[in-house]
Structures are given as structure tokens and as C-alpha cells.
């Protein structure tokens, strides 16, 4: 995920001060590949796999720290919703790992935020999303629309304020090596 040129564009917008002082971060990585309780027990259900926090949460945590720097404090909860699953041999196994993990975080910079990892999110195929709010604007991103970053600026005239789409293209490195025009991916 960190190779996505739109992440670098977001980082540049933040570094340039276009959002003003950053006041909050919200991130989620949610998918639905574990949402059906009839789905069989897999290697992902083994405690050594770490559950949803290790499987999906690691990606949104890496994104958060890439954009805003190190996290210094965490308060969270992890829950197991589907407590038993059948194996491929039709035996029942107890689940001892988390299905959903939610955390409140504070970055070293003082910015606060929330992070969620959820593999029971019915309908979500690749919801690796973040929103960053500042005193002068905001950005938001969804991996399901990986070529797009949305920017809101308080400096826009009131009658045209709103999130505007930035599309990845040749101006967004390293897309310049293979992308001839915006909108191609």
C-alpha cells in the first residue's frame, strides 16, 4: 500500500502545510473474507497469525505512521465475534484470535486518531481508507478508488468549497514511468 503514489501526494500535501495544523486521523482496513461464519477454519485463525490486527491492522498502522510519524500511545480493544469454525474435516475449532480491532492512538506529534481493522465487514473488498483533518483543510483516500485522493481546502471560496478529486497521473511519481494520462492505472 505504501507504494501507492497517492500516499506520497498526501504526504506532500501535509508537509507543505496545505491542511494547516493536523488535528486528527481516522483509518480503517476492512474486508469481508471472514464474514461468513460457515467459512472454514484457516491458517489465519491460528494464534500465531495474530488475528485481524496483525493481518489487516498492520497495513493501516503503517499508513498512519508513513503519513503522520510514529504513534506513541494506544488504547484499544480487540473482539472475537465468530467464536467457532468448522475445519475442512468438519471438526469444530474454537477461535482464539480477534475479528475486529479498534484503537485510539496519539502520534508523537500530539495528533490523535482512531484505527480499525475488521475482516467481518460485509460488502467491503478492500476498504483501506484514511481521513486526515487539519485547521485549513482535509484529505481522504480509499484503496477501493486507489487512483484518487480527495482534498478539501478552507481557502476555497465558500460557494465552491467541497472535496475535490485529485487523479493520479504522470505528475505523481512513479506513475510518470508508465502512466500516459490521469485516470489510467
How should each PLM-predicted stretch be described?
Residues 58, 117-125, 184:
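Glycine-rich phosphate/pyrophosphate-binding beta-alpha loops
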Residues 19, 106-109:
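A short, structured loop/turn motif at beta-sheet edges
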Residues 83-94, 102-107, 130-131, 136-185:
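C-terminal glycine/acidic-rich active-site capping loop/insertion
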Residues 49-52, 118, 180-185:
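Active-site rim elements
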Residues 2-95, 149:
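Predominantly a Rossmann-like dinucleotide-binding segment in NAD(P)-dependent oxidoreductases
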Residues 31, 80, 119-121, 145, ...:
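Flexible, active-site-proximal loop/turn residues at the rims of small-molecule/cofactor binding pockets
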Residues 95-97, 111, 124-128:
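Glycine/proline-rich active-site loop of Rossmann-fold NAD(P)-dependent oxidoreductases
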Residues 112-114, 138:
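Short, mixed charged/polar active-site loops
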Amino acid at each position: 500500500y505504501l507504494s501507492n503514489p497517492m500516499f506520497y501526494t498526501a504526504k506532500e500535501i501535509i508537509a507543505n502545510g496545505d491542511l494547516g495544523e493536523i488535528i486528527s486521523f481516522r483509518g480503517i482496513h476492512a474486508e469481508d473474507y471472514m464474514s461468513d461464519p460457515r467459512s472454514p477454519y484457516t491458517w489465519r485463525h491460528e494464534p500465531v497469525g495474530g488475528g485481524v490486527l496483525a493481518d489487516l491492522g498492520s497495513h493501516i498502522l503503517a499508513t498512519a505512521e508513513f503519513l503522520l510519524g510514529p504513534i506513541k500511545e494506544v488504547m484499544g480493544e480487540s473482539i472475537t465475534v465468530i467464536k467457532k469454525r468448522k475445519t475442512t474435516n468438519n471438526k469444530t475449532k474454537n477461535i482464539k484470535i480477534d475479528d475486529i480491532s479498534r484503537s485510539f492512538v496519539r502520534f508523537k506529534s500530539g495528533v490523535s486518531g482512531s484505527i480499525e481493522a475488521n475482516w467481518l465487514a460485509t460488502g467491503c473488498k478492500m476498504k483501506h481508507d484514511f481521513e486526515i483533518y487539519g485547521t485549513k483543510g482535509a484529505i481522504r483516500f480509499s484503496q477501493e478508488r486507489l487512483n484518487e485522493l480527495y482534498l478539501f481546502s478552507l481557502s476555497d471560496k465558500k460557494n465552491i468549497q467541497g472535496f475535490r478529486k485529485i487523479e493520479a497521473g504522470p505528475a505523481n511519481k512513479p506513475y510518470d514511468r508508465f502512466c500516459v494520462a490521469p485516470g489510467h492505472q
